[in-house]
Every structure is written in structure tokens, then in C-alpha cells.
């Protein structure tokens, strides 16, 4: 037993030793990989990358930047690369002592140092590339500025007539660029590449702006010397021709406005010669806006004339229609009021319309006289015609309503008479059905309702014979009688159906009288109620009695009665 325990302990010890050696082997692999990475890191061309700057002019800012980066290289190597070897050796020693955690810490520290070294290297690569690219960009801008400078100088010299008095200021501005180009060369030779970049970039913007001025100046001079004076002339003669055609354009004030615009235009060329192009453009824009305003006023007058010609025919027709309709209405009212009640306000409206129409006709005549003059302001004429058209339209609509009202009076009277005849016919039909039914007698309330309808009909018939008729009141009364008639018919139908249903229930229940005393007693009570015209109560008692001996039979009997 002891032997087995000793063997077990030995096995466990051997396994533990095996695990330790296995773990040490794995850690040694990590150390080897760390060593390999260190060798790769050492191959990074830190100094070679910095040597790219030696091809530049190592003075001034460039030299300062170069020295700073060179110092950074030394510090980076000493601080991040040199300690890596020591970390690796420490890890190996700890690993030999099976101190795995401490060894792993040393390996991790080594990788962190190499990560920082690589990061610093990449930062240096970016810095060097930025410096080289900035030098290239500076040279490209410089060459572009030189080309633009020469071209602008030739352009002003060759096309001096296009620039007018602005040619000399342009030449002076262009000549100012030469010392600025030389200043760039000085900054470049001194190695101040950042200052050189800022200087040449600003110069490039100045040249670009002046080039845009040179493109714009000939257009401004053309507009100032040719286009606008030509428009002034065209506008002046165009207005003169329109006045000959009969247009009143005094409100446009063409001559005075053009003279004022010519004065404003005279200030533009001096602005151009001083290269004050923004001010010149604002002045020209103001002149063009005022020209557009005059053109709009003139165009409005021309359109107004066309609209006047179109509107005159429409208003003439509308006025004739209004006048004819007014005469017709006055005649119809005098005729209709003998037979029908007419509101005095309607008659007064027609007389008022007559006065308004006459007034509008007078205004229209004055407008026509105005259009026959040698000079006409058609915009005012159009406004007046629009006023006339709106008012005539309102009058025609109101007069159409009145005419429809007069026609409706006759139609309403005929409709009321027709409804009254239908009421009388329907009333007699319903009453005959009551008399011919199985009722023991016609209930008194139906006799009363019939008499009320007869009285109402008699009164309305008397009103039909009176003149003038108040159609609205008559129509309302007939509508009331129709409602009474509908109530009379509905209630009569209910009574007739209930009477038949009650009779059917009693007849069917007779078969149970002999064997069921309570049924016999209930049916006797139902018969008594039936004779007294109390059909609903008779139905309730009969239904209750039959349902007690034959459930569901009352529903069947009721359906048969409804079908019949």
C-alpha cells in the first residue's frame, strides 16, 4: 500500500516536472519571437528616412526641423530600442528559474517599447514626407505664379484697348508681383519653407483675384460704354413710338429717369480705372434694376391695353344682360305679386339694382370716352373695367337668384297642391281599410285624427283660393299635414296588424279551452279587450296563455300574419 502511494507521488512529481518544462518551452518560443521582432525593428531605416531631407536646403526652418528630428532619433533609440535587449535577457534568466509570470512581464515590456519605437518611426516618416511635399507644393505654386505673372503682363500690353483707363493700374499691380516672387526665392534660400509656403500661397491668391478682375473689366467697360447707352436710346425711342400709338406713359418718367441713370453711369468708368470693381458692379446693378422697373411699367401698359380690348366686350354683354334682366324682374314682380306674396325687400333690391346698373353704364360710357383720347393710361382703364366687371357680376348673380325665386313660387304652389291631393286620397284609403277590417269599431282616436286632417285640408284649400298667396306659409302648413297623414297611416297600420294578430291568437287558442281552464279564462279576457279596441293588451294575454301550453307558437303565428 505504501509502495503504491510512493509510486503515485512520483508520477505526480514527474507530471508536474513535465508540465513545467513544457511551459518553459512555450515561453522560450515567445522570447525567440520577441528577439526576431527586435531584429526587424532594428532594420527600420530611421536615419535613412531622415537623410531624405539632406537634399533640401538645410538652413533656417528646414535646418532647425532636421536637427530636432535627428535628436529625436537618438532619444527614441536610447529610450525605446536599447532597453529591449536587456528585457529579453531578463526574461531568459527568469525562465531558467521557472518564474513564468515575471518572464511574461519582461516580454510584454519589451513589446511595449518596440511598439513605441515603431510609432515614433511612423511619425518621423510622416513629418519627412510632409516637409518634402510642402517643398514640392511651394515650387509648383511658384512656377504657376511666374507663368501667370508673365501672361498677365503680356495680356495687358497686347490688349491695352480692352482695359481702357484700368490698364495702367493693372500694370502697376502686376509689377508689384515681381519683388514678391523674389521674396519667395529669398525665403527658400534661407530654408524657411513654412514662411515661403505662406508667402507664395498668399501671392497665388492675389494673382488669381487680379486675373478674375482682368477677365471682368472688358465686360464691365463694354456694358458701360455700349450696352447701357444703347438700352437708354432704345427705351427712349420705344416710349416715343408707344406715345404715338396712344399710350400715356407720363407716370414712367422716362426722360428724367434716363438722364439720372446716365449721370450714375458716368461714375462707373472711374471706379473701373481704380479697380474698384465691387463698387462698379453695385452701381451697374442699381442702374439695371431701375431700367427693369421702367420696362415692367411699360410692359404692364401694353398688356393692359390688350386686356382692355378683351374686357370691353365682356362688360358690354354683362351690362346688357343686367339691364334686360332688371326690366324682366320688375315686370315679373308686378305680375307675380297679384297672385303671390312678395317680400318688399326683394322689390326694393330690384329697384336698387336698376339704379346701380344705370350708374355703372354711365361709368362705362366715361371709360369708353377715356379710351378714345389721344393718350390713354391703359393700366388705370383696366383697373376701372375690373371694378365694373366685379360689380356687374355680383348684380347678375343676385338678379338670377331673384328670378329663380319667382319661378320657384309657382313650382312650390303646384307642389303644395299636389301634396294636398295625395293627402286627401291617402286619408280616405286608410279610413276605408279601417272600416273594412275585422275591428269591432273604428277607434275614436282615428276618427279624431281624420277630422283634424280634414279641418287642416279645408283651411289650406281656403288659403289656395285667396290672393296673394303666402307660398312659404302655405308650403309649411302642407308639410305639417303630410306629417299628420303619415302618423295617421302608420298608427292605422299598427292597429290593423295587431287586430289580425290578436284574432289569430284567439282562434288558435280555442283548441285548448276545453282541456286548459287557465287558457280558456285568458282567452275570454283577450276577447273582452279585443271588443274594447285594446288590441295590444289582448295580444299580451293571448300570447302568455298559448306559450304556457305550446311554447314558440306565437312567433310562428306572428310570422304568418306579417307575410299576409
UniProtKB/Swiss-Prot annotation:
It is found in: Cell membrane. Residues 1-4 are extracellular. One of its GO terms (biological process) is septin ring assembly. It is a single-pass membrane protein. Residues 84-126, 165-223, 271-303, 350-435 form a coiled coil. Keywords: Cell cycle, Cell division, Cell membrane, Coiled coil, Membrane, Septation, Transmembrane, Transmembrane helix. Residues 24-564 are cytoplasmic. Pfam families: EzrA. GO terms for cellular component: plasma membrane; septin ring. Its main location: membrane. The keyword Phosphoprotein does not apply. The chain crosses the membrane at residues 5-23. Negative regulator of FtsZ ring formation; modulates the frequency and position of FtsZ ring formation. Inhibits FtsZ ring formation at polar sites. Interacts either with FtsZ or with one of its binding partners to promote depolymerization. Belongs to the EzrA family. NCBIfam families: PRK04778.1-6 (NF003412). This is Septation ring formation regulator EzrA. The lineage of its organism: Bacteria, Bacillati, Bacillota, Bacilli, Bacillales. The gene is ezrA.
Amino acid at each position: 500500500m505504501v509502495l503504491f502511494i510512493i509510486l503515485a507521488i512520483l508520477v505526480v512529481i514527474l507530471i508536474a516536472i513535465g508540465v513545467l518544462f513544457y511551459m518553459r518551452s512555450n515561453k522560450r518560443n515567445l522570447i525567440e519571437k520577441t528577439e526576431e521582432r527586435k531584429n526587424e525593428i532594428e532594420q527600420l531605416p530611421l536615419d535613412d528616412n531622415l537623410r531624405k531631407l539632406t537634399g533640401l536646403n538645410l538652413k533656417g526652418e528646414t535646418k532647425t526641423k532636421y536637427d530636432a528630428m535627428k535628436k529625436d532619433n537618438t532619444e527614441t533609440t536610447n529610450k525605446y530600442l536599447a532597453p529591449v535587449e536587456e528585457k529579453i535577457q531578463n526574461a531568459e534568466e527568469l525562465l531558467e528559474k521557472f518564474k513564468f509570470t515575471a518572464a511574461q512581464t519582461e516580454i510584454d515590456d519589451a513589446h511595449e517599447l518596440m511598439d513605441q519605437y515603431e510609432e515614433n518611426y511612423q511619425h518621423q516618416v510622416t513629418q519627412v514626407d510632409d516637409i518634402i511635399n510642402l517643398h514640392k507644393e511651394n515650387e509648383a505654386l511658384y512656377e504657376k505664379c511666374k507663368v501667370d505673372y508673365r501672361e498677365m503682363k503680356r495680356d495687358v500690353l497686347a490688349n491695352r484697348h480692352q482695359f481702357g483707363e484700368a490698364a495702367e493700374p493693372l500694370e502697376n499691380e502686376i509689377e508689384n508681383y515681381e519683388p514678391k516672387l523674389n521674396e519667395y526665392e529669398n525665403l527658400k534660400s534661407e530654408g524657411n519653407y513654412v514662411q515661403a509656403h505662406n508667402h507664395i500661397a498668399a501671392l497665388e491668391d492675389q494673382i488669381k483675384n487680379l486675373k478674375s478682375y482682368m477677365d471682368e473689366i472688358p465686360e464691365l467697360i463694354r456694358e458701360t460704354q455700349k450696352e447701357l447707352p444703347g438700352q437708354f436710346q432704345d427705351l427712349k425711342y420705344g416710349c416715343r413710338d408707344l406715345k404715338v400709338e396712344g399710350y400715356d406713359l407720363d407716370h414712367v418718367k422716362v426722360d428724367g429717369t434716363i438722364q439720372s441713370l446716365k449721370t450714375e453711369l458716368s461714375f462707373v468708368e472711374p471706379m473701373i480705372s481704380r479697380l474698384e470693381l465691387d463698387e462698379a458692379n453695385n452701381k451697374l446693378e442699381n442702374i439695371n434694376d431701375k431700367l427693369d422697373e421702367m420696362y415692367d411699367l411699360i410692359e404692364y401698359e401694353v398688356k393692359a391695353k390688350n386686356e382692355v380690348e378683351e374686357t370691353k366686350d365682356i362688360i358690354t354683354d354683362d351690362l346688357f344682360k343686367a339691364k334686360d334682366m332688371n326690366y324682366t324682374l320688375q315686370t315679373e314682380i308686378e305680375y307675380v305679386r297679384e297672385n303671390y306674396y312678395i317680400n318688399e325687400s326683394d322689390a326694393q333690391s330690384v329697384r336698387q339694382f336698376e339704379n346701380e346698373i344705370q350708374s355703372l353704364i354711365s361709368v362705362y360710357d366715361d371709360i369708353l370716352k377715356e379710351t378714345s383720347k389721344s393718350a390713354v393710361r391703359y393700366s388705370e382703364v383696366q383697373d376701372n373695367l375690373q371694378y365694373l366687371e366685379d360689380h356687374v357680376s355680383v348684380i347678375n348673380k343676385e338678379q338670377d337668384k331673384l328670378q329663380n325665386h319667382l319661378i320657384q313660387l309657382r313650382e312650390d304652389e303646384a307642389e303644395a297642391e299636389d301634396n294636398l291631393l295625395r293627402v286627401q286620397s291617402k286619408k280616405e284609403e286608410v279610413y276605408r281599410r279601417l272600416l273594412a277590417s275585422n275591428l269591432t269599431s273604428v277607434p275614436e282616436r282615428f276618427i279624431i285624427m281624420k277630422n283634424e286632417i280634414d279641418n287642416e285640408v279645408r283651411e289650406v284649400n281656403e288659403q289656395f283660393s285667396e290672393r296673394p298667396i303666402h307660398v312659404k306659409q302655405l308650403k309649411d302648413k302642407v308639410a305639417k299635414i303630410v306629417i299628420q297623414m303619415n302618423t295617421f297611416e302608420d298608427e292605422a297600420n299598427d292597429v290593423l296588424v295587431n287586430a289580425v294578430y290578436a284574432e289569430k291568437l284567439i282562434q288558435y287558442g280555442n283548441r285548448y279551452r276545453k282541456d286548459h281552464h287557465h287558457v280558456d279564462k285568458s282567452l275570454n279576457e283577450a276577447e273582452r279587450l279585443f271588443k274594447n279596441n285594446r288590441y295590444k293588451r289582448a295580444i299580451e294575454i293571448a300570447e302568455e296563455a298559448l306559450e304556457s301550453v305550446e311554447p314558440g307558437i306565437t312567433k310562428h303565428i306572428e310570422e304568418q300574419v306579417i307575410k299576409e
